[in-house]
């Protein structure tokens, strides 16, 4: 059995890879490992709008109840809401059934510990080991020792909306905004929060039918939102993904504003308020070099981690940083939540736009994005480290880096899932870096033939 857990829980095609049987086992093992020693543990369960959610929830909950835990089912709700509410309700753990931005046929199961954090690799390995060993030493409970399922009546959504609203001071009156809910988990929470704060709210893709989640919508397909914002003279647009743990934005001119710009704008504002701890933001190695340059001008440090919001969070927790995130729109505000939170990000950004008295595009001028080229080099899995060993490749990387002279960079990343090495170049001249990236990728491929 290979490693079951990926970077964001267990994911696969529902009913084929992520079966009801596997969901039952994950519920049983997760509840047992995360609540060991607790008298009558309670586990919060939420999901996105996928048609397979009901099937997987039934199986997952059966597993949870079989080891004596209570399952509090809150229905369709954003992933970050489960992280927040697990803490607020003093639950022993939280589980979300979602495959985030993936197409409808996929689904996933992701656990949070009692403090609202994603699980460590060690805990995930313990859950997998219990399943692999066929629940050896897990007692079979009967009678009154079996757990109960508790259907929650909407209070959870209300509590999450109130929490998200409390993260900004004042209101959003006078702001005209369009929200793209990706027909996903934010179709109630984000709309209500913005309306209650006084914004003029337009909404698209907020009619989930179980199969239209992420379909030509949300943060992975913002084209309709870009058009809508311009056509309706909105101050800004905000796009969520299926489980609303990320948010991308659109300025009033219809330009897509990614996570790098959001981090730059929010980082600068936190510094102005004296809340940017150690004057530092945390980003990944894939963030644009333009962000580094912009932050340097603002006297803000950038710390870089491996790709993945879990690594960003790890760095933030280690050094008590206030904000971090990824280009994809996973932004973590550690003062507010323990994971990427699309609604909290959207509200922070909207509030800054309103209070600044500037247009959104003017605020985005803080940063100039450098052209970026990504080329895949086909490399066998056992030779993915060739770029670290081969002298000619190393020499070529050094030459390119030297010629870019601080206004560009070379980044090489082996794929974690495919026989590929990704060659990424940034620089001021698109044509030049395109040529250099393809040349370097070809050199790497030729070396493994």
Swiss-Prot record:
<dbReference type="Pfam" id="PF00408">
    <property type="entry name" value="PGM_PMM_IV"/>
</dbReference>
<keyword id="KW-0460">Magnesium</keyword>
<dbReference type="InterPro" id="IPR016066">
    <property type="entry name" value="A-D-PHexomutase_CS"/>
</dbReference>
<feature type="active site" description="Phosphoserine intermediate">
    <location>
        <position position="100"/>
    </location>
</feature>
<feature type="modified residue" description="Phosphoserine">
    <location>
        <position position="100"/>
    </location>
</feature>
<keyword id="KW-0413">Isomerase</keyword>
<keyword id="KW-0597">Phosphoprotein</keyword>
<comment type="similarity">
    <text>Belongs to the phosphohexose mutase family.</text>
</comment>
<dbReference type="GO" id="GO:0009252">
    <property type="term" value="P:peptidoglycan biosynthetic process"/>
</dbReference>
<dbReference type="GO" id="GO:0005975">
    <property type="term" value="P:carbohydrate metabolic process"/>
</dbReference>
<dbReference type="InterPro" id="IPR016055">
    <property type="entry name" value="A-D-PHexomutase_a/b/a-I/II/III"/>
</dbReference>
<dbReference type="Pfam" id="PF02880">
    <property type="entry name" value="PGM_PMM_III"/>
</dbReference>
<dbReference type="GO" id="GO:0006048">
    <property type="term" value="P:UDP-N-acetylglucosamine biosynthetic process"/>
</dbReference>
<dbReference type="GO" id="GO:0004615">
    <property type="term" value="F:phosphomannomutase activity"/>
</dbReference>
<keyword id="KW-0479">Metal-binding</keyword>
<dbReference type="InterPro" id="IPR036900">
    <property type="entry name" value="A-D-PHexomutase_C_sf"/>
</dbReference>
<dbReference type="InterPro" id="IPR005841">
    <property type="entry name" value="Alpha-D-phosphohexomutase_SF"/>
</dbReference>
<dbReference type="InterPro" id="IPR005844">
    <property type="entry name" value="A-D-PHexomutase_a/b/a-I"/>
</dbReference>
<dbReference type="GO" id="GO:0005829">
    <property type="term" value="C:cytosol"/>
</dbReference>
<feature type="binding site">
    <location>
        <position position="241"/>
    </location>
    <ligand>
        <name>Mg(2+)</name>
    </ligand>
</feature>
<dbReference type="InterPro" id="IPR005846">
    <property type="entry name" value="A-D-PHexomutase_a/b/a-III"/>
</dbReference>
<dbReference type="GO" id="GO:0008966">
    <property type="term" value="F:phosphoglucosamine mutase activity"/>
</dbReference>
<dbReference type="Pfam" id="PF02878">
    <property type="entry name" value="PGM_PMM_I"/>
</dbReference>
<dbReference type="InterPro" id="IPR005843">
    <property type="entry name" value="A-D-PHexomutase_C"/>
</dbReference>
<dbReference type="InterPro" id="IPR050060">
    <property type="entry name" value="Phosphoglucosamine_mutase"/>
</dbReference>
<dbReference type="Pfam" id="PF02879">
    <property type="entry name" value="PGM_PMM_II"/>
</dbReference>
<protein>
    <recommendedName>
        <fullName>Phosphoglucosamine mutase</fullName>
        <ecNumber>5.4.2.10</ecNumber>
    </recommendedName>
</protein>
<comment type="function">
    <text>Catalyzes the conversion of glucosamine-6-phosphate to glucosamine-1-phosphate.</text>
</comment>
<dbReference type="InterPro" id="IPR005845">
    <property type="entry name" value="A-D-PHexomutase_a/b/a-II"/>
</dbReference>
<feature type="binding site">
    <location>
        <position position="245"/>
    </location>
    <ligand>
        <name>Mg(2+)</name>
    </ligand>
</feature>
<feature type="binding site" description="via phosphate group">
    <location>
        <position position="100"/>
    </location>
    <ligand>
        <name>Mg(2+)</name>
    </ligand>
</feature>
<dbReference type="InterPro" id="IPR006352">
    <property type="entry name" value="GlmM_bact"/>
</dbReference>
<feature type="binding site">
    <location>
        <position position="243"/>
    </location>
    <ligand>
        <name>Mg(2+)</name>
    </ligand>
</feature>
<dbReference type="GO" id="GO:0000287">
    <property type="term" value="F:magnesium ion binding"/>
</dbReference>
């Amino acid at each position: 059995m290979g490693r079951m857990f990926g970077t964001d829980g267990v994911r696969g095609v529902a009913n084929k890879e992520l079966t009801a049987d596997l969901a039952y086992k994950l519920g049983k093992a997760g509840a047992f490992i995360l609540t060991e020693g607790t008298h009558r543990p309670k586990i919060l369960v939420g999901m996105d709008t996928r048609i397979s959610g009901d099937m997987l929830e039934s199986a997952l909950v059966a597993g949870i109840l079989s080891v004596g835990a209570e399952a509090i089912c809150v229905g369709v709700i954003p992933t970050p809401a489960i992280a927040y509410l697990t803490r607020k309700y003093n639950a022993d753990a939280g589980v979300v059934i979602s495959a985030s931005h993936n197409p409808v046929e996929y689904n996933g199961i992701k656990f949070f510990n009692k403090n609202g954090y994603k699980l460590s690799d060690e805990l995930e390995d313990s859950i997998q080991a219990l399943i692999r060993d066929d629940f050896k030493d897990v007692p079979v409970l009967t009678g009154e020792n079996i757990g109960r399922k508790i259907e929650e009546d909407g209070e959870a959504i209300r509590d999450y909306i109130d929490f998200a609203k409390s993260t900004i001071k004042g209101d959003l009156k006078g702001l005209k905004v369009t929200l793209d809910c990706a027909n996903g988990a934010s179709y109630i929470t984000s709309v209500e929060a913005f309306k209650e704060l006084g914004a003029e709210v337009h909404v698209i893709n907020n009619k989930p039918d179980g199969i239209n989640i992420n379909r030509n919508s949300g943060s992975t397909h913002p084209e309709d939102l870009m058009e809508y914002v311009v056509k309706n003279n909105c101050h800004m647009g905000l796009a969520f993904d299926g489980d609303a743990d990320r948010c991308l934005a659109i300025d009033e001119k219809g330009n897509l504003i990614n996570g790098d710009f959001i981090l730059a704008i929010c980082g600068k504002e936190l510094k102005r308020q004296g809340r940017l701890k150690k004057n530092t933001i945390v980003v990944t190695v894939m963030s644009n070099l333009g962000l580094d340059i912009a932050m340097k001008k603002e006297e803000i440090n950038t710390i870089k981690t491996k790709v993945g919001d879990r690594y960003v969070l790890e760095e933030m927790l280690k050094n008590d940083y206030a904000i971090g995130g990824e280009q994809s729109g996973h932004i973590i505000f550690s003062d507010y939540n323990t994971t990427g939170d699309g609604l909290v990000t959207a509200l922070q950004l909207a509030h800054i736009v309103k209070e600044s008295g500037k247009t959104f595009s003017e605020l985005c001028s803080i940063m100039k994005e450098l052209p970026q080229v990504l080329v895949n080099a086909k490399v066998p899995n056992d030779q993915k480290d060739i770029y670290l060993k081969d002298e000619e490749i190393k020499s070529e990387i050094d030459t390119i880096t030297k010629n870019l002279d601080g206004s560009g960079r070379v980044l090489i990343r082996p794929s974690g899932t495919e026989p590929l090495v990704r060659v990424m170049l940034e620089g001021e001249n698109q044509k030049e870096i395109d040529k250099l990236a393809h040349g370097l990728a070809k050199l790497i491929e030729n070396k493994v033939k």
